[in-house]
């Protein structure tokens, strides 16, 4: 699949490094009833909004990225023989919030085919004001928002929320977006948009769900900026996420995956 032109996306969100420490784990510690992991190797990849960025860029989208500069890391310790995650250790520093001047500069010199907010609620976007500011200023640009916040602006028709079932259930009852402005992902059951369910028809072996929501979001925007038909974009994103969960760690989509999805 060839892009008809060069598409540009503004991505704003929390960034981290995903890390996997692999090793052999076949005995308990004599000091405490916990497993001993003999380290064999380490893999790292961009996580959270960084994962969205990597997927978009891999598919040929130009991305302007506004994120925290402080290094956040999620380290998972994995038994190589079973691929069982033993424990996850998070390093989460205090994050300086997005400064209005950063956003102003990014919006001043470029026009974007879409804007993405990937908000893991780690402090870079301390409230929902950024959503309102962007959506109100650019009413003709779709703003895709993946957020863990429970109080959301609902008055903007150009905002598309992408949240999972748990996040949907946690929403403030007085701040639930209209059905056409909200996609709720359901894991291996697919997604719901505008009261319509989009099942994931691919029967796949789930190897690792890390970053699957980021893959869904990136694939959704990748498709939508080229062909703004939400039903088709969701179906495409479902298949992209199904590919991601079959791979260990955070998987980066490739154009070969796009061709495979479109040829199914």
Predicted region positions:
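Ribokinase/PfkB-type carbohydrate-kinase core domain
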Residues: 1-32, 40-207, 224-239, 247-264
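Short glycine/threonine-rich catalytic loop with a Thr-x-Gly-x-Asp
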Residues: 202-220
């Amino acid at each position: 699949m060839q892009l008809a032109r060069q598409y540009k996306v503004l991505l704003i969100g929390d960034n981290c490094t995903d890390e996997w420490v692999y090793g052999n784990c076949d005995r308990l510690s004599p000091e405490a009833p916990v497993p001993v992991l003999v380290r064999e190797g380490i893999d790292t990849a961009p996580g959270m909004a960084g994962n969205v960025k990597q997927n978009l860029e891999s598919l040929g989208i130009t991305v302007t990225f506004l994120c925290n500069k402080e290094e956040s890391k999620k380290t998972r310790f994995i038994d190589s023989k079973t691929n069982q995650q033993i424990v996850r250790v998070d390093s989460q520093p205090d994050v300086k919030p997005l400064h209005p001047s950063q956003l102003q500069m990014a919006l001043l010199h470029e026009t974007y085919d879409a804007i993405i907010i990937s908000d893991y609620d780690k402090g870079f976007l301390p409230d929902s004001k950024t959503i309102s500011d962007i959506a109100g200023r650019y009413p003709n640009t779709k703003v895709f928002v993946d957020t863990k916040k429970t109080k959301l602006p609902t008055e903007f028709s150009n905002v598309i929320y992408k949240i999972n079932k748990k996040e949907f259930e946690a929403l403030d009852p007085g701040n639930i977006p209209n059905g056409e402005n909200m996609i709720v992902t359901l894991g291996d059951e697919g997604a719901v948009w505008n009261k319509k369910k989009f099942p994931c028809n691919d029967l796949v072996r789930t190897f690792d769900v890390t970053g699957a929501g980021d893959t869904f979001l990136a694939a959704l925007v990748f498709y939508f900026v080229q062909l703004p038909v939400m039903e088709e974009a969701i179906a495409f994103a479902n298949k992209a996420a199904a590919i991601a969960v079959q791979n260990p760690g955070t998987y980066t989509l490739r154009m070969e995956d796009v061709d495979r999805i479109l040829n199914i």
